[in-house]
Amino acid sequence: MKIIKRSGTEVTFDIDKIVNAIRAANLEVEESSRLTDRQVVYAAQNVAEACENAGHTVSVEEIQDLVEDEIMRLDCYEVARHYIIYRYVQSLKRQKNTTDDKILSLIECNNEEVKQENSNKNPTVNSVQRDYMAGEISKDLTQRVLLPQEIVDAHNEGLIHFHDSDYFAQHMHNCDLVNLEDMLQNGTVISGTLIEKPHSFSTACNIATQIIAQVASSQYGGQSISLTHLAPFVEVSRQKIRGEVARELEELGVSASAEKVREVVEDRLRDEIRRGVQTIQYQVVTLMTTNGQAPFVTVFMYLNEARTPQEKHDLAMIVEETLRQRYEGVKNEAGVWITPAFPKLIYVLEDDNVYENSPYFYLTQLAAKCTAKRMVPDYISEKKMRELKLSKGETAGNGDCYTCMGCRSFLTPDRSGNGFNNVANALNYDPNKPKYYGRFNQGVVTINLPDVALSSHQDMDKFWKIFDERLELCHRALLCRHERLMGTLSDAAPILWQYGALARLKKGETIDRLLVGGYSTISLGYAGLYECVKYMTGHSHTEKEGTPFAMAVMQRMNDKCAEWKAASDIDFSLYGTPLESTTYKFAKCLQRRFGIIPGVTDKGYITNSYHVHVSEEIDAFDKLKFEGMFQQLSPGGAISYVEVPNMQDNLKAVIRVMQYIYDNIMYAELNTKSDYCQVCGYDGEIKIVEDDGKLVWECPNCGNRDQEKMNVARRTCGYIGTQFWNQGRTEEIRDRVLHL
């Protein structure tokens, strides 16, 4: 059995250390108040048994909590008091330097917590380690200097989660929609070099990847770009190629019909589109940003975003090539085609591509084929989104359709009625269009809903009182995020604030006016709605006895966001948090505070946002229909999914699910398995098995358990992860049931 030390390193459990610790405290009290040797060993054995049954790799802090409980259970309160004093003294000693051990264990690749924190970072690589080292320093500064103690304590106890404290020391924001159109059409500056409007599609793609890398290095959250912004350069290349063909024919003294010339031009154009799309795919997965990872970038594919029929035709060619190349995948170091994590693709389901007789249905068929093999694209319903996202003056069904920022964070609709009066000085400003590209999110703080419920002891009046108190705590924490960004100079990230990605401010100008008035958002996250409802009502939120309470919880959070927004002119918005490593942290905190409660705290994870519990039997269509209700109440960020088996031979069923998404839910994805064993060549699902109390990945064909010799891709938190996960998230992945 393994345990995790405070430094994050994983070591073998040693019962003798528990025995010795209890004996040391025992010797500090009078003989008449001491435990017998038999009681000492009995207590240690009970602790060991509790660790075995915990369902996850326990930490030193958890073990010490168990020791305290055991001593007090034996009515030796004086011994327990001395043990608590000993822990307190050791804690004070550790506070003198909170980072050295963590950083040293990180460098030596012994820090298990860091190894499993981010499923898209490889913590053995020098550049990643440097980012993690900086992150540990930032976390330390955040907790000791930058945040009020009440926020720090609430975060450490798992009442709330203050996200991305490893970047909070700097003046950095979360995620955004890159105004790629402005940068490509009107020029930008990268690393002090002027980049003018490109003269071909392939050059535009190359510049786009440089912009993606620069943006990723200037923020900590995801970014999104639209293929629509690249579409005009298809016509630029078409005209350029047409001129080249004409010159070649003239030089050869050959004449050709207009139709033949058109065929040659279009063939060469498609080849250039292929090369341009390939540039984006390979650059994105091979670039290393200052965050120690490939850029978290989402590529948006929305045909109705095109301005003219010709541009829409050209955009369709780009979308087609993007889907074809993603279906193919990328080669791993052994030359085997595998599923890449990035870029994330979002395909908009529209009236002209979703049904069999629609003109762009061939793209939807290709998207279905790609999803069945590579788990992308994800799907946004134009129909449902235009019902929900209403800018000033718009009516239901005539609203806006736009991409999320990264994996799931959505901007609030444009409430200005004039594109925010071009507060960002964009050169592609149109006062008659709602403004989305160039806007961003300031950050997230998440409330632990199961903790609110458990703290109330099933007393409804007490629940709402505690809920309001915790929400106000989140509010104060979010204001800390907002105030950290206030006063930030545009010089802090020129690519973002001066050269068009988000704004074109002057040097030395602050970004303050972009933080209010609705231009940017700030997110109240939530997690564990299922566990919260289960504890308070005894029912899943999918059952009629639990659904009304779940909806009331969601509405209360929306009401609070509206209240805070009215008071401050900051766009607070409710966000379904994509817990990755934090799901494990919250679960451990709940077990520490409330013990093991069947159906509520008996897992190493809690359920993301409003989702149906991963182990609950429900079919794909019922799940999407049910969760669609909650997406309406999660306007700042939401994504739903269905787990499916290998669907490569049943694409009609995939398309049926996609059509159901179009009619019933704004944003959803299909999860399948796409793994490869480098030892035996097995191509299928790598299984999760238990080994000495720890969950490990194992090839079902040859038994290989070496994570360095397998490629595993699983959807976690809206992105595809490929670097493995902590024990809590791994347990959640194991427990997922199929919905189709």
Roles of regions detected by a PLM:
Residues 273, 277, 281, 534-535, ...:
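Metallocofactor- and cofactor-centric catalytic cores in central/energy metabolism, strongly enriched
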Residues 23, 475, 479, 530-534:
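Amphipathic, well-packed alpha-helical segments that form the structural scaffold of globular domains
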Residues 89-92, 96-518, 539, 543-705, ...:
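Conserved catalytic cores of very large enzyme subunits
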Residues 14, 694, 716-719:
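Conformational switch/transducer regions in large eukaryotic molecular machines and scaffolds
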Residues 1-109, 734-739:
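Charged, amphipathic alpha-helical regulatory modules used
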Residues 701-740:
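Long insertion/accessory domains within large nucleic-acid-processing enzymes
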Residues 301, 522-535, 555, 715:
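Contiguous, well-ordered alpha-helical segments that form the cores/surfaces of helical PPI scaffolds
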